């Protein structure tokens, strides 16, 4: 695995890299807050896709079950193929799932196509967020980065 590129200005203090933490925060908030975001779309799901209350409950449940059931496997894959590749794989699966949900003509495809893909993608992204921090940040910056991810989880 490639070493992270860090900048050491005069005095030996490591510069905190902002762009990577922004990407990791957005990934953490996107995956952690997914069910909350779905709750905002309830009325549209009813109006456009003809969703029933059990459909919406199932859509919420399927994401959590997929993400949780494959989380350990997603972390194991990350240790084998590398955290960056694992993160990209998870992001691609999440993007594909979001596209399926956006284009789905009914709740069946929305749930069993889109929500499954997004949950499966999250099972790769969430461990990758935590796995990338030690490769990017060191010392006090690592503590700050983990704190930012914890705050992002709390906000979502």
Question: What are the roles of these predicted feature ranges?
Answer:
Residues 2-156:
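Transmembrane-helix bundle of Major Facilitator Superfamily
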């Amino acid at each position: 695995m490639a070493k992270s590129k860090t900048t050491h200005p005069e005095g030996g203090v490591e510069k905190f890299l902002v762009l990577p933490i922004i990407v990791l925060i957005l990934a953490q908030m996107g995956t952690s807050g997914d069910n909350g975001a779905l709750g905002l779309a309830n009325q549209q799901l009813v109006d456009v896709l003809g969703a029933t209350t059990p459909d919406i409950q199932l859509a919420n449940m399927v994401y959590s079950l997929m993400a949780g059931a494959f989380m350990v496997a997603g972390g194991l894959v990350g240790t084998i193929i590398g955290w960056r590749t694992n993160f990209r794989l998870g992001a691609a699966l999440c993007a594909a799932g979001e596209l399926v949900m956006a284009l789905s003509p009914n709740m069946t495809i929305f749930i069993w196509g889109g929500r499954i893909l997004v949950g499966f993608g999250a099972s790769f992204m969430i461990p990758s967020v935590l796995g990338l921090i030690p490769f990017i940040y060191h010392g006090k910056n690592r503590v700050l980065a983990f704190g930012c991810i914890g705050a992002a989880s709390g906000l979502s």
